[in-house]
Amino acid sequence: MGYYDIDDILADGTRFPCRFNYDVPGLGYLEGNPGRPISKNAKLELPLWMVHLLAVVGAQSNEDSRVEEPLPFVELLPPDLFAPRVLNAIKSGATSLDLHSISPHFYTLAEKWATLFSDKELSQVLKDMLLERGQEINNHAISVSMFSNCNQTNDSAVFLQTLDEFEKTIYRDTNVNCKEMKKWLVLK
């Protein structure tokens, strides 16, 4: 993804739940209380770009000076996006899942989450899901480009609406490449 990739920017704006580990003066406006502090253990939903920074940067705690590594400002809480029920649904049948309704930027967010927490299980689930859904995306892209005179079937249209933005890019690229291959074969 590039520096100005709109999908990456939109994914970074997705709100994730977090819990503050410190009392922070002057940030009450994040809770809707301007001029007041955010209290310790306050739970908020903040954009991913902000939560990521606050989860990495730590502050020195006055409570326990023996701790060598500073506690980060916030602790990221697992979002509903990666809840066990969602992961189980992916494992049981990734092609039947409406990924767009879960999040339009599911793959981007999952990649960032797995990288941030070194989550090997999530990475494996994503890999398996991409392989399974990728085959289905390829089948739909090829069938549309091969039979461009025919109308799309209802199943194909429904499946295409369940794709997230990354999968839509894969679909478009596959479709264009199939059309180019078809042209090349005709010329040969």
Swiss-Prot record:
One of its GO terms (biological process) is mitotic DNA replication initiation. GO terms for cellular component: GINS complex. Keywords: DNA replication, Nucleus. It is found in: Nucleus. Pfam families: PSF3_N (PF22466), Sld5 (PF05916). Belongs to the GINS3/PSF3 family. The GINS complex plays an essential role in the initiation of DNA replication. Component of the GINS complex which is a heterotetramer of SLD5, PSF1, PSF2 and PSF3. This is DNA replication complex GINS protein PSF3. It comes from Kluyveromyces lactis (strain ATCC 8585 / CBS 2359 / DSM 70799 / NBRC 1267 / NRRL Y-1140 / WM37). The lineage of its organism: Eukaryota, Fungi, Dikarya, Ascomycota, Saccharomycotina.
